[in-house]
């Protein structure tokens, strides 16, 4: 999608109709009518995968004490009470099942509600399509800086979890 770093509200951004139209065209091309397409959406789930903020050793106070994702300790399930992430209790449980089925360690990132928080396209996708969505990500240091840093194991673990999710073995 275009314009992800500035809000996604454009024709080519996640807030536009592109994903919705592509999915409907795929459904119609496989013989589904509109009612079947809508039923398929209702029965679907989505993983929004965008990196997560790892606790920075210079700024540990910026994380909730019980929710401090660390590099190379597994992907993080991301939660925000203002819905800046799409994760719900139901979709967090889905992600946990997927991680456990894949044999992948996982962590939880809960953004502090007294500090600003960025967002992902997860809430946009969930809102536009009505699909249960979970936001997950590889913990990284210095997000949006010239020197972002993540571990070597976390991307491999996330790839293994995505393979398990897409294979339906959870």
For each feature predicted by the language model, list its residue ranges:
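Acidic/histidine-rich catalytic neighborhood of metal-dependent amide-processing enzymes
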Residues: 1-67, 169-170
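Hydrophobic alpha-helical scaffolding
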Residues: 8-16, 81, 85, 111, ...
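Generic recognition of stable, solvent-exposed alpha-helical segments in well-folded globular domains
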Residues: 14-21, 90-94, 116, 120, ...
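Short, surface-exposed linear patches
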Residues: 19-22, 67-71, 128-131, 148, ...
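Generic secondary-structure signature for well-ordered alpha-helical cores
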Residues: 24, 28-31, 97-105, 141, ...
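Active-site-adjacent substrate-binding region
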Residues: 54-140, 144-145
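His/Asp/Glu-rich mid-to-C-terminal helical/loop segments that flank catalytic regions of hydrolases
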Residues: 138-170
């Amino acid at each position: 999608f275009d314009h992800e770093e500035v809000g996604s509200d454009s024709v080519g951004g996640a807030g536009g109709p592109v994903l919705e139209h592509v999915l409907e065209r795929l459904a119609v091309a496989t013989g589904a009518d509109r009612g079947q397409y809508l039923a398929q959406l209702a029965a679907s789930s989505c993983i929004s995968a965008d990196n997560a903020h790892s606790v920075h050793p210079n700024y540990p106070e910026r994380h909730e004490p019980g929710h401090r994702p660390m590099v190379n300790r597994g992907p993080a399930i991301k939660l925000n009470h203002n819905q800046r992430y799409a994760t719900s209790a139901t979709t967090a449980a889905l992600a946990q099942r997927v991680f456990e089925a894949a044999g992948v360690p996982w962590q939880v990132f809960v953004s502090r509600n007294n500090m600003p928080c960025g967002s992902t396209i997860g809430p946009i996708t969930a809102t536009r399509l009505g699909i249960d969505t979970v936001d997950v990500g590889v913990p990284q240091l210095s997000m949006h800086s010239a020197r972002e840093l993540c571990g070597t194991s976390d991307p491999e673990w996330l790839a293994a979890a995505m393979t398990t999710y897409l294979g339906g073995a959870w």
